[in-house]
Amino acid sequence: IIVCPDGDVTSWYFDSPIDKKMRYETYLFKELVESIDNTYNTIAEKSGRAITGLSMGGHGAFYLAFRHQEVWGAAGSMSGGVDIRPFPKNWDLSKRLGDYAIYKENWENNTVINMVHLLKGDDLKLIFDCGVDDFFFDANKRLHTKLLERNIPHDYTERPGGHSWDYWANSIKYQLLFFNDYFAY
């Protein structure tokens, strides 16, 4: 079963500490998963679930998987915004987290690159990639380095390309192969 929930363009998949109506983390990791498990014949445990996304959804997939390793056994990100701090004026982030100068703690606590400490060994299978011409490239490379420093196994790929549907049309093939192998075990 593949489920593609709407990320509302700028939800960033967390529960906003500023806008209490933005409860995407709760919706996705709790309400949606429970609804799918109650409606369909699923493997209702982490070994039967994976999450992935692109761009904001790549941030969201890793954010949710890092924070809720009891829900997902594998996670992927394509061109993910894995460090949102360099972009305080973009994509409604200040509406979700508050002004960076005032609410720096919100930004530090809700960016994927600062959540690597939550990972333990190879308990969560990870795949991510980014095009070398993508504005998120540097952040993905830094995440890769942090994972290496902590000896967290992961698949990471850099390829030609930017932040585009052409790039993701190619990237998704590798993600699907990775998840197919994950579910085969």
Question: How would you label these PLM feature ranges?
Answer:
Residues 1-185:
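Non-catalytic cap/lid and distal C-terminal segments of serine-dependent acyl enzymes
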